[in-house]
């Protein structure tokens, strides 16, 4: 029985050793995969960062252009309002002057008639 026990214990020790080796191997492989993944992520970030910055600059330029166009449009609207107001005032003044001149002409005509 002792020989069978020895063989069983030896087999158990062999299995235990193989399990430990497998565990260590898996841990090493896991660490390698993790490091490769981190390196890949870093590479992707490094590649994407300049492109993202360029896109951000372009978006800012577009936003600045839109803001400038809005300001220009608002200024044109204000200028148009001022011109319209001036035209209305001028028309009113002209109408008043025209009415005054008509009355004056009538008075002059009545004096000479």
UniProtKB/Swiss-Prot annotation:
Keyword annotations from UniProtKB, A to Z: Acetylation, Cell membrane, Coiled coil, Isopeptide bond, Membrane, Phosphoprotein, Ubl conjugation
Gene: ZEO1
Residues bearing the modification Phosphoserine: 2, 25, 40
PTM comment, free text: Phosphorylation of Ser-25 is induced 2-fold in response to mating pheromone.
Subcellular location per the Swiss-Prot or TrEMBL entry: Cell membrane
Gene Ontology BP annotations: fungal-type cell wall organization
Record-given protein name: Protein ZEO1
Reported function: Acts antagonistically to MID2 in signaling cell wall stress to the PKC1-MPK1 cell integrity pathway.
Bias (Polar residues) ranges: 1-16
Any one GO CC term of the record: mitochondrial outer membrane
Species for this entry: Saccharomyces cerevisiae (strain ATCC 204508 / S288c) (Baker's yeast)
Compositionally biased intervals (Basic and acidic residues): 17-37, 53-82
Region Disordered: start-end pairs: 1-96
Membrane-spanning segments: none
Coiled coil: 2-97
Predominant location: membrane
Residue numbers carrying Phosphothreonine: 49
